[in-house]
């Protein structure tokens, strides 16, 4: 454990690990493989690739790893990739003054405090903590710890346990699997998921405080797609680098898989009643991608339509069921149809 702590300290808590950088490089390579025509056209037309970040060190390092791999894969892009531009209102909105109500919710909302306290107080928490402590320490030492101390230790251990795979390059050979029994690790993972769900995910039924602030990012996705369709942007592509605090609420607004069900006050979030899982909603290098395509030409004199395809964590993903794709089972949608079903204007 000390080796892992030392590695995390040397890296800097919250900074991008070697594994994280490689995840971004791999994602960039796969993007080029999926859309070779896009990058060929960008290079041929000398169109810029815009790069935007939250300004946080981790996001900037992610951008550099990603764009470095893009250029390595296609040297013709050299000179076309812009330097990272910081946009905190768009990509770090949870910390901005306009969302003070969200931070007040985290700090002191009575419903939030009550539901998390009730989940933490489930008997399984004390049981898992006690089991963890008694497996690792002498009986007399374990008996001298209060229940709260056992829980604090076990949950701190789980944080290290869950971080270890991301630090395998910085702390090679460190394996914390023997320190936590799988059922106990699963329970502590659930406690973390419950906290994320109520702080950044669908949250309480009838309340939008955890995700309404992501509207600015959804609006910008539409604005960029509309500009591409209208031919009013010089950018060949726009790459953004942000955080789970932004991806998770955006996933709710987009109705992405696992992010569609808030929890009624009378039936708190649990694995048995809700599909939301942090490892699926926002894994390392989580991403949302919109591809805009010029559609087939219409009748003479009619404008060419544009289609949008969404990828979520690099998988083609349907928009909400209120949006109608170009054909049954397709992942392509007319841009005008998306504008209609997201309430951005009447369908043409």
Predicted features and spans:
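Signature for phosphate-centric chemistry
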Residues: 1-50, 54-238, 242-348
């Amino acid at each position: 454990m000390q080796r892992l702590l030392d590695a995390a300290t040397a890296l800097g808590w919250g900074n991008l690990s070697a594994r994280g950088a490689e995840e971004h490089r791999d994602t960039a390579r796969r993007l080029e493989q999926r859309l070779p025509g896009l990058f060929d056209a960008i290079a041929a037309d000398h169109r810029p690739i815009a790069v935007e970040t939250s300004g946080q060190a981790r996001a900037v390092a992610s951008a550099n790893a990603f764009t470095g791999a893009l250029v390595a894969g296609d040297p013709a892009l050299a000179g076309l990739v812009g330097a990272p531009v910081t946009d905190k209102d768009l990509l770090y909105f949870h910390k901005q003054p306009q969302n003070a109500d969200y931070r007040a919710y985290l700090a002191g909302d009575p419903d939030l405090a009550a539901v998390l306290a009730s989940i933490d107080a489930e008997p399984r928490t004390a049981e898992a903590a006690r089991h963890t402590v008694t497996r690792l320490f002498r009986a007399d030492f374990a008996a001298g710890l209060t229940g709260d101390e056992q829980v604090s230790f076990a949950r701190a251990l789980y944080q290290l346990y869950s971080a270890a795979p991301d630090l395998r390059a910085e702390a090679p050979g460190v394996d914390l699997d023997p320190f936590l029994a799988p059922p106990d690790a699963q329970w502590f993972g659930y406690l973390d998921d419950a906290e994320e769900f109520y702080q950044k995910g669908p949250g309480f039924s009838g309340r939008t405080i955890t995700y309404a602030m992501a509207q600015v990012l959804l609006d910008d996705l539409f604005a960029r797609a509309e500009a591409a369709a209208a031919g009013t942007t010089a950018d060949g592509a726009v790459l953004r680098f942000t955080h789970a605090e932004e991806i998770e609420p955006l996933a709710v607004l987009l109705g992405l898989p696992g992010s569609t069900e808030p929890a009624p006050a009378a039936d708190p979030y649990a694995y048995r009643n809700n599909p939301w899982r942090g490892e699926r909603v926002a894994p390392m290098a989580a991403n949302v991608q919109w591809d805009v395509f010029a559609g087939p030409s219409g009748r003479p004199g009619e404008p060419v339509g544009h289609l949008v395809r969404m990828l979520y964590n690099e998988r083609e993903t349907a928009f909400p069921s209120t949006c109608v794709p170009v054909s049954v089972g397709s992942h392509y949608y007319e841009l005008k149809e998306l504008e209609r079903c997201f309430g951005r204007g009447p369908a043409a």
